[in-house]
Amino acid sequence: MTDRIPMTPEGYEKLKEELDRLIKIERPAIIKAIAEARAHGDLSENAEYHAAREKQSFIEGRIQELQAKLARAYVIDPSKINQNKVAFGAKVRVIDIDTEEEKEFHLVGPDEADVKNGKISITSPVGKALIGKEVGEQVTIKAPAKTFNYEIISISFE
């Protein structure tokens, strides 16, 4: 897995903060919880011990996952991108040609995507359709249930 993961500076920092929290706070706390549970005696019927070990396994797995993502991260500063076209990190305002409803999409890397907050992956159908387009251009996005027709009304990089 040598594929680079595009990421905004904010997304990179968010993952770093989570990793730091897991290593500096969560890991020591679970080690302490395991030691305390172990002190209660028979481990075969010690629910606290087994729960703590399970949580430790989850934490260690997440630490490894975050370390791998951060190692493969390619941080892209949107402010240094050609701002005439939709690109990674752009906030794109569109109008649905059929319903005249306005929407805003923030194009981010796959690990930062959060559809509920308008952050869509550049690898999603919407992201792929918008990349490289300019204000005034129209895009058609075919979804399983419906086809969307958007016109780009603004592009910004913040």
Swiss-Prot record:
Task of the protein: Necessary for efficient RNA polymerase transcription elongation past template-encoded arresting sites. The arresting sites in DNA have the property of trapping a certain fraction of elongating RNA polymerases that pass through, resulting in locked ternary complexes. Cleavage of the nascent transcript by cleavage factors such as GreA or GreB allows the resumption of elongation from the new 3'terminus. GreA releases sequences of 2 to 3 nucleotides.
InterPro entries: GreA/GreB_C_sf, TF_GreA/GreB_CS, Tscrpt_elong_fac_GreA, Tscrpt_elong_fac_GreA/B, Tscrpt_elong_fac_GreA/B_C, Tscrpt_elong_fac_GreA/B_fam, Tscrpt_elong_fac_GreA/B_N, Tscrpt_elong_fac_GreA/B_N_sf
Domain of life (superkingdom): Bacteria
SUPFAM superfamilies named in the record: FKBP-like, GreA transcript cleavage protein, N-terminal domain
Regions annotated as coiled coil: 47-73
GO term, biological process aspect, one: regulation of DNA-templated transcription elongation
Gene3D superfamilies: Transcription elongation factor, GreA/GreB, C-terminal domain (3.10.50.30), Transcription elongation factor, GreA/GreB, N-terminal domain (1.10.287.180)
Gene Ontology MF: a single term: DNA binding
Family indicated by similarity: Belongs to the GreA/GreB family.
One Pfam family from the record: GreA_GreB
Database matches in PROSITE patterns: GREAB_1 (PS00829), GREAB_2 (PS00830)
Keyword tags: Coiled coil, DNA-binding, Transcription, Transcription regulation
Name of this protein: Transcription elongation factor GreA
